[in-house]
Amino acid sequence: LCAPVNYNAAYLSQLKSLIDSDCILTDVGSVKTSIHKEVIRLGMEESFIGGHPMAGSEKSGFMNSKAHLIENAYYILTPTAKVAKEKVSAYKEFVTSLKALPVILDYNEHDIITGTISHLPHIIASTLVNFVHDTDTADGLMKALAAGGFKDITRIASSSPVMWQQICLKNGENISHILGHYIEALTQAKEQIDAENETALYSMF
């Protein structure tokens, strides 16, 4: 299953009658809790191994595919409690054959980790782009003068809005908690700047 996370979960019911007991069903979505809950609800736990290749770009669609995209990238697997160990081993071997690096995680742990290292950076990038758009000078000097650093940190802001809307909704509880802690860190940085705290500012960078 390789679609925005809402659609991946919705397709499960359509696939249930089409797969046999030997089948391995997987996905490549960035949120795991929601699809695992649907797998459990449908009684498909003996077939499902969640998957998430930690690779990609801001571009979406098969026309932007790359043959070597996941080489040397971590590939997270989130097997259900009831899937056979033989299936997990077989899928790990398949991932390894693609020259990716399989890592097994609990699906709840996956969503906390990706919420911090993937979902939060996308939110930061998008809000920064929107902030510059909303506060730019009348003649657009901010946009015109934005150089390498700004472009590096905001490149991912051009990712699929449908995909990221659904990720934020499906992993919302974790993302909200993580954002709260990040806002605290930004507040501390502001306080250090206001206080002209040279030592703290040096340590931050």
Language model region names:
Residues 11-63:
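Rossmann-like NAD(P)(H) cofactor-binding subdomain of soluble oxidoreductases
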Residues 139-205:
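Interdomain hinge/lid region at the active-site interface
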Residues 69-154:
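Internal alpha-helical scaffold of NAD(P)-dependent oxidoreductase catalytic cores
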